[in-house]
Amino acid sequence: MDEEVENKVILHGSFASPYSKRIELALRLKSIPYQFVQEDLQNKSQTLLRYNPVHKKIPVLVHNGKPISESLFIIEYIDETWSNGPHILPEDPYRRSKVRFWANYIQLHLYDLVIKVVKSEGEEQKKALTEVKEKLSVIEKEGLKEIFSDTDGEPTVTNETMSLVDIVMCTLLSPYKAHEEVLGLKIIDPEIVPGVYGWINAINETSVVKDLSPPYEQILEILRAFRQMSLSPVLETYQS
C-alpha cells in the first residue's frame, strides 16, 4: 500500500484489454504519469481482488491508495479530478449528456456484438455481424449529429477534443482493419457508414492513439489467439 500511495496513480489492467486501453488513453490525454500493473486474468492477483472485491475485474485505477473500478466511471473520475488537459466530458450539461448517452449506447449495444463476431462462426457470426452493421447505421444517422454538433455532424477528433465517446469507440473499433483481416469479413463499409468510417479513422490519426497502439502484426496475433481460445470452451469475463 505504501508504494501505491507514493506512486499516486496506478492502473491494474491487461495489455490486450480494450477496457484498460480506455483508461490509458484518458490518462495520456491529461498527461498524467501512471504505473501500469499487468494482471494475469487467469490467475488474478490478491491486490486486484482486494481492490475490486465485488466484480473482481480489470481495470482498477488506484489514486492515492484508493481504488476506482469500472472503466466509464474511472474516466469520469479522471476528468473531474485533474483539470489539466482537455475535457473528456464537455462542460456544457446538454453536450455532456449526449456524449454520455452515445458512449453508453456503444457500450450496451455494440461492444458485445463485436466481440460475438470475433468469437463465433457460421450463422451465429452472420447474425451478430448484421446487428453490428445495424447499430453502426444508427450511429451514422442519429449519433454523429449529436456527438459532433459543433461541426454539423462532421467527425473531427484531435488530442485536444477527444471525448468519452471517442475513447469508447476507439477501444472497440480502432483496430477494425485487423478484425476484417482475421475474420475475412467487412465490418465498416465506407459507402454505407461514411461518417462512422471517417470518425474511426480520425481517431486513429491522433498521436495519442498512435502512441498507445501496438504494431499491426501484434494486433493480428492477439485477435487470432482470442478467436482460437473463444472457439474452445467458454471464457470467463474479467474486464469492465
Swiss-Prot record:
Cellular compartment(s): Cytoplasm, Cytosol
Presence of the UniProt keyword Transferase in the record: yes
Gene3D superfamilies noted in UniProt: 1.20.1050.10, Glutaredoxin
Positions of modified residues (Phosphothreonine): 161
Pfam families noted in UniProt: GST_N_3 (PF13417)
Ranges in a coiled coil: none
InterPro entries according to UniProt: Glutathione-S-Trfase_C-like (IPR010987), Glutathione-S-Trfase_C_sf (IPR036282), Glutathione_S-Trfase_N (IPR004045), GST_C_Tau (IPR045074), Omega/Tau-like (IPR045073), Thioredoxin-like_sf (IPR036249)
Reaction equations catalysed: RX + glutathione = an S-substituted glutathione + a halide anion + H(+)
Swiss-Prot/TrEMBL GO biological process terms: glutathione metabolic process; toxin catabolic process
Keyword Iron-sulfur tagged: no
GO cellular component, one term: cytosol
Main location class: cytoplasm
Keywords: Cytoplasm, Detoxification, Phosphoprotein, Transferase
Stretches assigned to the GST C-terminal domain: 92-226
Domain GST N-terminal: 7-86
Binding site for glutathione: 17-18, 43-44, 57-58, 70-71
A single GO molecular function term of this UniProt record: glutathione transferase activity
EC number: 2.5.1.18
Protein family membership: Belongs to the GST superfamily. Tau family.
Protein function: May be involved in the conjugation of reduced glutathione to a wide number of exogenous and endogenous hydrophobic electrophiles and have a detoxification role against certain herbicides.
Protein's name according to its UniProt entry: Glutathione S-transferase U9
